[in-house]
Design a protein with these regions (language model features):
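Aromatic-lined carbohydrate-binding surfaces of glycoside hydrolases
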Residues: 1-249
């Protein structure tokens, strides 16, 4: 699987359909599948923990058929909002999927943290020395985040730069909320700056890669960064894509 598969084909699969798929995968020797169902539940819990309102969360998390591109930092909020019942359903479904994957000897690849954040909300108002604050502001924080170019006409989420202290703080919260719902994994899928035509000024790919790796390793020292080699930007700049790949640890 890649993320797109989850929206192209699997957005509304129930357990019966997933059970059939997982059994087929086991019969064909697949042992390292991406397990992205219910990733939005992690983000919902993280944002609630930071004091975001339901409306603010709805403006960030995409609807079921667009979750793949939201997870790849390409868009936010499109196709939503999702009802509370959706999050409850998908959390329960992911837990069944993970259990069956492990029963068949598979190693699930869970989504990791790339630096993505809501584009128009000030995280600095909510974080102080790693502790959440229950205050909110709808103003953007230039020091906390940067923005990437539009993706196929969609406004992209914000991105925390690796030298911003809030990167580590949000990453820690992300992995904590992931573990609460789904446990830890030995493999995490992280595709930073996906299909970006332009990047924040002064961005150091090496620093970004180390920050991503360090946060993942803090969650699980044995974890492996699972990187999908589909980083060619929509402008077709192969040199830029290669510089990103070579910089990551």
């Amino acid at each position: 699987f890649n993320y797109c598969t989850y929206s192209y084909s699997m957005a509304f699969w129930d357990w019966k359909r997933w059970e059939k798929e997982l059994d087929w995968m086991a019969l064909h020797g697949i042992n390292l599948p991406l397990a992205a169902v219910g990733h939005e539940c992690v983000w919902r819990n993280l944002l609630l923990r930071l004091g975001f309102s339901k409306q603010q969360i709805n403006n960030f998390i995409a609807g079921p058929a667009f979750l793949a591109w939201w997870e790849m930092n390409n868009l936010e909020g499109w196709g939503g909002p999702n009802p509370d019942s959706w999050y409850e359903q998908q959390e329960a479904l992911q837990k069944k999927i993970l259990q069956r994957m492990k029963e068949w000897g598979m190693h699930p690849v869970l989504p990791g943290y790339s630096g993505m954040i809501p584009s128009k909300l000030d995280l600095g108002k909510r974080i102080d020395s790693g502790k959440e604050k229950k205050t909110a502001s709808d103003t953007s924080s230039e020091s906390a985040q940067s923005t990437l170019n539009k993706w196929n006409g969609f406004d992209r989420p914000g991105i925390l730069l690796p030298d911003d202290p809030k990167f580590t703080q949000i990453a820690n919260l992300f992995y904590e909320e992931t573990e609460k719902l789904y446990g830890t994994s030995d493999y995490y899928s992280i595709d930073p700056f996906h299909e970006a035509k332009s990047l924040p000024a002064g961005l150091d790919f090496g620093k970004a890669g180390r920050a991503i790796m360090d946060a993942m390793k803090k969650a699980n020292p044995k974890a492996v960064w699972w990187y999908k080699d589909g980083q060619k930007p929509t402008s077709g700049n192969d040199e830029s894509a290669e510089s990103r790949r070579s910089a990551y640890p």
